[in-house]
A protein has these predicted regions:
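Terminal low-complexity, intrinsically disordered regions
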Residues: 1-55, 164-174
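Short edge beta-strands and adjacent turn/loop segments
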Residues: 89-115
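Hydrophobic, glycine-enriched assembly/anchoring segments
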Residues: 120, 141, 153-174
């Protein structure tokens, strides 16, 4: 309430809602981001916060036991996605997925897919195949992004939001 009182002293912040959230930062060596754990709001002109509400949010790597605890089907689909890519492309290593669960449902998936770049034609072929696999395995996820990269160099981006009927595909020029 000390922070809220100080904010309310500012004329620009006197008559607007102010929202607070507590964020738990991940460990320094973690690949997944931290997460919001609770939130509260002070309505217009209020000097006290409403009740705090827990935020049921969790980030996990795919595949992993944490992801399987939240959505075993998604975890298995990601394994199959990787297996199919390894079967189709002899020089493919493995994709890394990060998923954000909200209320135990996958809300956002980000996949980093490393490739060895052999030319634009191969990038197009890989991107087409990955798009087919994404449609097959990630169709039930509202938002996903698959970043195809050669080292740090982006080669293609496949993304889909809940409003998209089909994934959006962008192949970067050399």
């Amino acid at each position: 309430s000390e922070i809220l009182s100080r904010l309310r002293e500012n004329d620009d912040l006197k008559d607007i809602p102010i929202h607070f959230a507590i964020y738990k930062q991940s460990s320094e060596d973690s690949i997944t981001p931290g997460e919001f754990i609770t939130q509260a709001t002070a309505e217009k002109s209020q000097t006290k916060l409403n009740e705090w509400h827990n935020i049921n949010e969790k980030s996990a790597l795919l595949p992993s036991s944490t992801a399987a605890d939240y959505d075993e089907n998604l975890n298995n689909n990601f394994k199959q996605f990787n297996d199919n890519l390894q079967s189709y492309f002899s020089n493919f290593t493995q994709a890394v997925g990060k998923v954000k669960f909200v209320d135990k449902k996958p809300q956002r998936l980000v996949v980093d897919l490393p490739i060895d770049y052999y030319g634009q034609a191969e990038t197009i072929g890989i991107t087409q195949y990955v798009t087919e696999q994404a449609n097959k395995y990630f169709d039930k996820i509202d938002n996903y992004e698959i970043r195809i990269k050669d080292g740090n160099q982006p080669r293609a981006l496949i993304s889909k939001t809940k409003d998209d009927k089909e994934p959006q595909v962008h192949i970067y020029s050399n």
